[in-house]
Amino acid sequence: QIALTVEGEFIDESVAAETEQVLKNLEAVLGAAGCSLACVLKTTIFLTDMNDFAEVNDVYARAMGKHRPARATVEVAGLPRGARVEIECVATAAACREGKSSL
C-alpha cells in the first residue's frame, strides 16, 4: 500500500502523513477481510530514504500499539507515484479468531 486515499488522491505532505494513510489503507483492506492490524504476522516497509526511518517508525508503532509483528525495512530506489513509503503485510484471520495478536 502507498498513501492513496479511496478517492485516488496521493497524500504527500510529509512522510508521517504518508505513513498514516498507508496504515489506514492496510486497516481498510484487513477490515474488509474481517481482520485488523492485530492479525498481521509480518510487514515489509519500503523507504526511498532510510533517513525517514525514525519518523515512519513512530507512526507505525502508534498504529500497531502493543502488537509487534515481524518486520523488515528496506531502502529502495523509487516507489510508485513518488511515494516515500510503502508497506506490505502478511496477515491471517486465524490469529484474530483465536485471540492471538502475534506469533
Positions of PLM-derived features:
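Short, polar/acidic, helix-capping and beta-turn segments at strand->helix junctions
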Residues: 1-103
